[in-house]
Each structure stands twice: as structure tokens, then as C-alpha cells.
């Protein structure tokens, strides 16, 4: 079996890549301006990149595609929040605590979750209120708005500051997990393996009926089912799409595609072609190397970049 790819980059479209890179480098001190394949980039210390293409008009963020936002580990989330509050060019995104109104800047400033789901339903919030449950404070997750309308999560407290995930929507998260494992040899996230292993016969499920909070939208969000895989130390983590509209093609939007590194592109092309995977672009030159682009289970564009040695 071919070795699992590594996470190489998240490709963003931007009206001003240099300004975007400068913004991110100021918010995450461990990162630095770089370039790769002739394109401007932001380098994270775990050897992954945000890669940028310059576009003439602001990139679209609607209709919703499979890519929702990307996230960073930080060592002290409240220290980061304090720094961001002092910077006029940083817009913090509120986490709404109920559909009645009210918001907090960090998830741990509202009622804590009671299980593996990172939020509470209306009924669970009512129960927490009745029992006098109070926020735990401390570490948690929070969001800021990046250039071009990007949503950026910062999560702590973690040992090292680095890019750590791309949060996505999927038509069927369990089926997506199977797809990434079958076609791209992805690993399950340690500690997050499904309690009951899914197969292609039973991976399709109904979306959970209850919205949960905290959430980036006042009406709350559906957090079940959820699934994830990991490439190197970068997770792809998924919730089911939030409405009845099919997810759009990522290409040309703000979050254009995700990219993985492979050692032998020809071997991967042969494997994926034999498995009936959809190719969006046949092998093409990319900087000093080659790449192909395939389509994921919810129309996300996935680039495979050959990185020999």
C-alpha cells in the first residue's frame, strides 16, 4: 500500500496576498512569509503552508462549499484574545450562546459541553441553567475574521503554535471518512475512532435534529454526525452540511482547494484511476514539480503534489 500523503497546503484566493500573509504572520508569531512553486505563501512551523493566488475581485464565500474554515493551535488562547482585542485590524467573531441572543469570545465562557459534542442543545442549556452550571473559563476555541472574509479558528491551550486543522462540511461525514481512508490512505484521529465502524452499506445517516451552541450563527449549528481523518498533524474534521443545499465546487472560492504531498505521483494516479476517482486536472507542472487535482466526496478540490525524497 502506498504511504499516506502528508498535508501540504491550503490554497486561498486573495485580492492582496502580501497583505493577507502579513496579517496572518502578525497574528501567529510562529509563522513567516514564504513562497512555494512561484506563489506567495505563509509557512507554519509544522511544515505546512497557506498558499495564495492573486485574484482581481474579492473571492466568493457563497454558495457554501465543503471548506468551512481553517484553524490554528495557540499556546495561550486568552493571551491571544487579549492581543487581538488591542489590534484595530483584527475583527473577532462572536460565539452565540443561545438563539435568544448573547455571545462570548471563547467557547469556555459559556456552559460547558457534557459529552463529546462541542455544544449544548436547547434542552441541555435549559438543564444547565436549572442546575446553576457556570462556565469553566480557561482554554477553549475562538474565531477571528481574516483577510478576504476568511474564518480562522484559534484554539488553546496547546503545546505549540501551528496550523492544525481544516474544518469542513460533508454531505455524509461517515462516508467521507471512508472515502479518504480508501482512496488517500488517511489515518483516523487518535482517540476519535468511531464507536461502531462504518461501511459503505451503513455510512449514510440522517443529520441530528438538534442545533447546538456556542455557534458562529445565532440560530446554532448541527454538530452530529461528525467524523475526521488526519494527514501528518493536520486534521480534516467534518460536520454534515447545515441545510438542504448541495455543497458547491470549492474552485474559485476563497478556500480554493486542499493539497497533499505524495512521493510517487504516477503510482497515485494509477491507484486513483483504478478506483474510479474523478480527476479535475490531469498531471500538470507546479513550480519545480508536478501535481494532479481530484474531486473529494463533497466536491472539494484536492491537489496531490509530488514531493520526492
What are these regions (language model features)?
Residues 1, 82-168, 187-230, 237-241, ...:
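Vicinal oxygen chelate
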Residues 56-75, 79-82:
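Post-signal peptide N-terminal segment of secreted/secretory-pathway proteins
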Residues 15-17, 74-79, 172-173, 262-266:
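Helix N-cap motif at beta-to-alpha junctions
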Residues 171-185:
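Short, solvent-exposed cationic patches
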Residues 11-16, 167-172, 196-197:
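Conserved beta-strand-loop-alpha-helix junction that forms the acyl-donor binding cleft
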Amino acid at each position: 500500500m502506498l504511504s499516506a500523503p502528508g498535508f501540504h497546503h491550503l490554497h486561498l484566493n486573495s485580492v492582496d496576498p502580501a497583505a493577507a500573509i502579513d496579517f496572518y504572520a502578525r497574528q501567529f508569531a510562529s509563522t513567516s512569509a514564504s513562497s512555494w512553486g512561484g506563489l506567495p505563501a505563509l509557512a507554519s512551523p509544522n511544515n505546512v503552508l497557506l498558499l495564495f493566488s492573486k485574484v482581481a475581485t474579492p473571492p466568493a464565500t457563497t454558495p457554501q462549499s465543503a471548506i468551512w474554515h481553517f484553524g490554528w493551535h495557540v499556546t495561550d488562547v486568552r493571551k491571544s484574545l487579549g492581543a487581538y482585542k488591542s489590534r484595530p485590524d483584527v475583527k473577532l467573531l462572536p460565539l452565540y450562546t443561545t438563539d435568544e441572543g448573547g455571545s462570548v469570545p471563547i467557547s469556555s465562557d459559556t456552559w460547558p459541553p457534557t459529552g463529546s459534542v462541542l455544544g449544548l442543545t436547547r434542552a441541555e442549556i435549559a438543564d444547565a441553567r436549572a442546575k446553576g452550571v457556570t462556565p469553566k473559563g480557561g482554554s477553549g476555541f475562538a474565531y477571528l475574521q481574516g483577510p478576504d472574509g476568511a474564518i480562522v479558528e484559534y484554539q488553546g491551550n496547546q503545546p505549540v503554535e501551528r496550523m492544525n486543522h481544516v474544518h469542513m462540511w460533508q454531505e455524509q461525514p461517515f462516508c467521507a471518512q471512508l472515502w479518504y481512508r480508501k482512496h488517500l490512505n488517511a489515518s483516523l484521529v487518535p482517540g476519535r475512532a468511531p464507536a461502531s465502524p462504518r461501511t459503505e452499506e451503513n455510512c449514510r445517516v440522517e443529520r441530528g435534529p438538534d442545533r447546538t451552541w456556542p455557534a458562529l450563527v445565532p440560530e446554532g449549528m448541527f454538530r452530529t454526525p461528525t467524523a475526521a481523518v488526519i494527514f501528518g498533524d493536520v486534521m480534516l474534521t467534518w460536520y454534515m452540511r447545515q441545510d438542504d443545499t448541495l455543497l458547491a465546487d470549492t474552485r474559485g472560492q476563497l478556500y480554493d482547494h486542499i493539497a497533499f504531498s505524495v512521493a510517487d505521483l504516477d503510482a497515485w494516479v494509477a491507484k486513483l484511476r483504478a478506483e474510479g476517482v474523478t480527476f479535475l486536472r490531469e498531471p500538470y507542472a507546479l513550480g519545480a514539480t508536478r501535481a494532479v487535482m481530484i474531486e473529494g466526496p463533497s466536491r472539494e478540490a484536492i491537489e496531490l503534489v509530488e514531493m520526492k525524497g
